[in-house]
Amino acid sequence: STNVLTALRTAPHIDGSQTERRAIKHLVRCMREGIRPVNILIKIPLLLPGEYAVTEIEPARSLYAKLQDIESQQGILDASILIGCAWTDSPYTSVSVIVVAEENSQKAREYAGSLARDIWMRRREFGPDVETVPVEEAIEKAMKAEERPVFISDSGDNVTAGGAGDIPIILEKLLDAGASDAVIAGLADPDAVRLCIQAGVGSDITLNIGGELDRVNGYPLAVTGTVEHLDPPSLAVL
């Protein structure tokens, strides 16, 4: 069981330290004053990819701003919005609202219900704040762009949200398009790293990259390249 629930309030997440301090403050207060907090959770039947709920743009900006208004009410300890992970195949994933009361569960339920209704009423306003296109089209636009650099993000294979981080599809499409001035931020493949270490810096090598951790969404890609840099035992640059 949990005494007090509190969550991050920024997306992308930049308020980790503030959230930790807030949780500790609540816990210490409850211990010192003998408060027995009540956590009220309301789940909303809504799946939102994280990039649809960036807190610097609407509607997330004004919805998250309501949290402080709720917390300012007498008898309320904390309030949180949890976007959830849309890609998690689980009955527990969805947007949720949590309000923590000092003791009065009815008051917490009222505030949680009001915030949940606000989110539901604005559900069609959620969306990405950047252009979304198929991989091939994204690469074509990036190669023609006059302003550089251009970032292409695979929001599905997200290692901070449960993705394997080893899907080489974008790399494959870049090679097919002849994008010689592109950089892939990283692919998880311990076996490929070991092969590069065995070959040594400056060596030409042909090997398979990616597609080992998750064969559902990706597959190994055969590539040939030069080992440019090594940081054993965990990093190789081709």
PLM feature spans:
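A generic structural motif
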Residues: 126-133, 181-191, 208-212
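Short acidic (Asp/Glu) and glycine-rich catalytic loops that position anionic groups and cofactors
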Residues: 3-7, 42-46, 91-96, 148-154
